[in-house]
């Protein structure tokens, strides 16, 4: 199974997410790890557009996905995100279970290729992303990713549910 599954059916307002993410960037929380410092803004009452996107996802795909967290993630152009998996981190950043897979929506920046070990490079705008496979990226420009993090469901099961068309 490929490590990403591109999404073509949007449930988000890209312009609204971009504007909110840019405004919230100054409030990003910093999570230093051994390899890189993660910069993120989690979904709160100060992120109504992110909350709308999450609710739209839940309406479009009314399944039990378990715990999902949402955030904006910031990566500077040229910053090296070396080989890593998201479900094994050197730093506990929350009380939530580790991330099993994500939906990543690029709302700012170029569509730089993400490289997956043993799979090669993939370019995406929006995709279900298997974060349990070693991957890396060095973006050419600053990137902002809107991210839904699935804490209790594996990539294969999320893809299966997302591919099941409901409400179309």
Describe each model-derived feature in a short phrase:
Residues 101-106, 126-128, 141-160:
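A short hydrophobic beta-strand segment most commonly corresponding to one strand
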């Amino acid at each position: 199974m490929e490590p990403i599954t591109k999404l073509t059916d949007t449930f988000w307002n890209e312009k609204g997410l971009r504007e909110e993410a840019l405004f919230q960037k100054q409030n990003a929380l910093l999570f230093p790890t051994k390899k890189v410092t993660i910069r993120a803004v989690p979904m709160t009452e100060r992120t109504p557009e992110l909350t709308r996107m999450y609710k739209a996802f839940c309406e479009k795909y009314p399944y039990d996905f378990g715990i999902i967290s949402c955030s904006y993630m910031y990566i500077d152009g040229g910053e090296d995100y070396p080989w890593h998996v998201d479900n094994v981190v050197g730093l506990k950043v929350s009380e939530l279970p580790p991330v099993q897979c994500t939906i990543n929506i690029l709302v700012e920046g170029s569509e730089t290729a993400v490289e997956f070990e043993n799979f090669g490079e993939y370019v995406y705008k929006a995709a279900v992303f298997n974060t349990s496979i070693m991957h890396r990226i060095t973006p050419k420009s600053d990137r902002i990713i809107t991210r839904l993090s699935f804490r209790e469901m594996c990539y294969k099961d999320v893809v299966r549910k997302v591919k099941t068309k409901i409400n179309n």
